[in-house]
Amino acid sequence: MDQIDISCIPTTPGVYLYKDPAGKVVYVGKAKHLRRRVASYFRDIQRHTPKTRAMLRSAATVETLSTTTEKEALLLEASLIKKHRPRYNILLRDDKQYVLFQLTRKHHWPRLVLTRKVRKDGSAYFGPFTSGQAARQTWKVIHKVFPLRRCSDKAFRNRVRPCLYHFMNQCPGPCVLDVDRDGYMQMVRKVEMLLAGRSTELIDMLRADMQAASDALEFEEAALLRDQLQAVERTVERQAAVLPGVHDMDAVGLAEAGGGLALSVLFIRRSVLLDKRNFFWSGLTLEEGPEVLLSFLTQYYGPGSFIPPRILVPWDIRTEDREGAELAPAAVCTDAGLLPDTPLLPDCPEAAPLPAAPVFAVSAGDVMPSGHDADPAGTADAPVVRGDSAPEQPLPAAVPPLCAEESASGSALRAVAEMLTELRGGPVRVLPPRNATDNQLVTMATENAREDARAEKRPDVAGVIAAKLGMSAPPVRIEAVDVSHTGGSNTRVGVVVFENGTPARDQYRTYAFADDEAGGDDTGVLALWAVRRVHSGPPWPDLLLVDGGRGQLAAVMTALESAGAGGLFAVASIAKARNEETGRADRRAGNLADRIFLPGRSNPVNFKSGSPELLFLQHVRDTVHDYAIGRHRRARSGAALSGELQRMQGIGPATARLLWEHFSSLQEMVDAGEKGLAALPGIGKAKAAVIHEGLKRLVG
């Protein structure tokens, strides 16, 4: 990129966007002082990191957007990164938030549900959990011990008879029965105490209630309380405290290992290490640490995510006019040991194994309009773990660096804290370690990041793919396309996206084609799709992978060139392995050598069978294949639903879908009778009679 006229750039806070010659955004950054920040890119270029130098080589222009405050610049930067997915920014997958427990306290009859979004609706939220399966198992166990209602609010309003869970003694049936609300709310409070980690208090309450019921000769009630008490006590045995007196917070650690930069975030709730999440960026070093940390904080804790009241980070980051962001003294380990000038941690202990996340132990995450960091009593209900679950030697007390609220006005963490405070609706503190306890948590996160990077071998798959396919740079964004139809009907083209080797499910797309337009011709449909893809615009892939052979590849290339997108990105196709004798696709008997074709080349590219790069391309192809088939089957099912059932009186799309979800055939619907149909949510006796009569005529 040539030198630009710096005098045209404003001196306000804001966001700058570097664009390549085609106008594609390749990097988004924020600055407290736009002119000085942009000017820093053109001073002593050789001192920049390799990634920054590569970005400057690919950039042709730079644009700026001014804001009034640095906090607004952070919000705008996060929004633009999510929109443009720039090649040289640190990108996090945001297709799926982690699982949370939501207790709908504002409802007259609260229920406990699993959710991935935090809403300011008065509910209490607990978590997060990275394993949805473990969270669902926990949810089932909680309902067996404390049988709250399970039905949705809509089903609750429309239900006319108790559901099956009531007859299994797993729901009191407040939807239609006269249930003691005081007793129900007492059960809700017990669930909240369990999820909030107040196990000791809950056990004492259950034991007292059990004794009172026994003294009153209410032995059935006493037996129920005994079962609840035993279940809670078993739960407490599985809980493990990281540090006594530590409450709701996340601890972030970074380490340079495994040929890249690893980041780990620990979720700590009520002294319990609830879960953790690891990230890795190949080719980065601790020189990019400040950028990685700031980008992580602004992307990971976005709108709708769970934001704790306190976030520990490895360093303070001060925004300097001359260079954007630089580190305060760091407490970070590398493969070679500690970085110079790290007074917080005098040594780098061997990594201690992290305590396993409790199967049934969850904790408080209530989002309140006015936040409260921790229990003022400072008590920890879970037992303190000794031995291997925590560092054996306590870290020495450190001179506390300035936290976000106390630091100089130039601290980038202050702007991050202000942004997260606004999103959370309560105070959020983002700060480096201030004492030995904080040091221990950050060290644990740092060591966990390093060990995860070392344990997982990460071959340079993208680099090998780029070399094999003749690409100028490793592909960051890969799009794969496949067609699915049944005899030319309900044709669907599925597109999946992989970024940095992981699926970007929020960017999956489905393209529908009319039967007369598709005609059952896969190559023709792919050509039509290619034109529509060009018209939809960026973000463009670095590599487009077509599921098919030379014919499908040629059709896509011809369409791209006619649409003016020839050479805009690399294109290849992947075809299943074929039997040498029959010429038919055959992946049996270990024949995994699928063939990769390039435009203008008759013979396939030589990929070693079973190599990581070929297995990755096969995984991408299998993903788009399954996705396209799934979308086609959904379209075919929808057509069947609208065909048979919706011609009947009293059945619309919602009722038709409800019937097909509960029955596998029309005959099963008839056999269920009016009583069975009326038991479905939203279908009363009168409607069930009409539907049953229509079904009998339809079946004949």
From Swiss-Prot:
According to the entry, every stretch annotated as the GIY-YIG domain falls at: 11-90
Q: Which residues form a coiled coil?
A: none
A single GO cellular-component term from the record reads: cytoplasm
Its Gene Ontology biological processes? nucleotide-excision repair; SOS response
Matching entries from InterPro entries are given as:
GIY-YIG_endonuc (IPR000305), GIY-YIG_endonuc_sf (IPR035901), GIY-YIG_UvrC_Cho (IPR047296), Hlx-hairpin-Hlx_DNA-bd_motif (IPR003583), RuvA_2-like (IPR010994), UVR_dom (IPR001943), UVR_dom_sf (IPR036876), UvrABC_protein_C (IPR050066)
Question: What NCBIfam families has UniProt attached to this entry?
Answer: PRK14666.1 (NF011260), uvrC (TIGR00194)
Briefly state the protein's biological role. The UvrABC repair system catalyzes the recognition and processing of DNA lesions. UvrC both incises the 5' and 3' sides of the lesion. The N-terminal half is responsible for the 3' incision and the C-terminal half is responsible for the 5' incision.
Q: Which HAMAP family match?
A: UvrC
- Membership in a protein family: Belongs to the UvrC family.
Q: What is this protein called?
A: UvrABC system protein C
